[in-house]
Every structure is written in structure tokens, then in C-alpha cells.
Amino acid sequence: MRFFSYLGLLLAGLASLQGFSTDNPLEEELRCWCLYVKNCRFCWACQDGLCKNKVLKDMPPVQEHSYPMEYCMLHRQCKYITDGPIFQVECTMQTCDAIRLLNA
């Protein structure tokens, strides 16, 4: 019986991800995405070939179409690095949810 409870929770979580697009996340989700996953294209505002992070204002600008800009689009993954491990999250998964899964 417990199995079905877990299965139901898992399916409910997956259903909430349906239709989620990393092309243009909601403004209130940007902070969660971009604090931990700085390499996602939507975290950056670009003008004249230079891009500034929308959330991390103290980050230096990067060139448009550089590695951080294109990683998510090419590999369908967003990536962030901590002192030891490298965490990769599929672009279709909300970062906050992925962090909870990694820490579980």
C-alpha cells in the first residue's frame, strides 16, 4: 500500500513539470533558478554582445554565446559546481525541486 502512496506522489510531481519551459521561467522563479544554476541562458540579460546575470548583480558580465550561454541549450542540462561535486539538472526540471532531490 505504501508503494502506491509513493507512486502517487511521484506522478503528481512529474505532472507538475509538464508544460514547464526553461525558455522563459516565471519572474518569481528566476532567483531560485539563477542562484544555483548560473549557466542557464534565461538567467542573463544581453545587450551589445555582453550579458549580465539577472539575479547575481555582482557577477561580472560574460560574452553572449559563450559557454555559460549555450550549455543549457546544447546539452539540455543546466550545471552548477560546488566545492566538490558538479550537479547537473535537466533543463525541464525546476532547479529548486532538483536541489531538494539531491539533498534528500
Curated annotation (Swiss-Prot):
Induction: Expressed in the early phase of the viral replicative cycle. InterPro entries: ASFV_fam_110 (IPR004848). Residues 1-19 form the signal peptide. Keywords: Early protein, Signal. Pfam families: v110 (PF01639). It comes from the Viruses. Belongs to the asfivirus MGF 110 family. Plays a role in virus cell tropism, and may be required for efficient virus replication in macrophages. This is Protein MGF 110-2L.
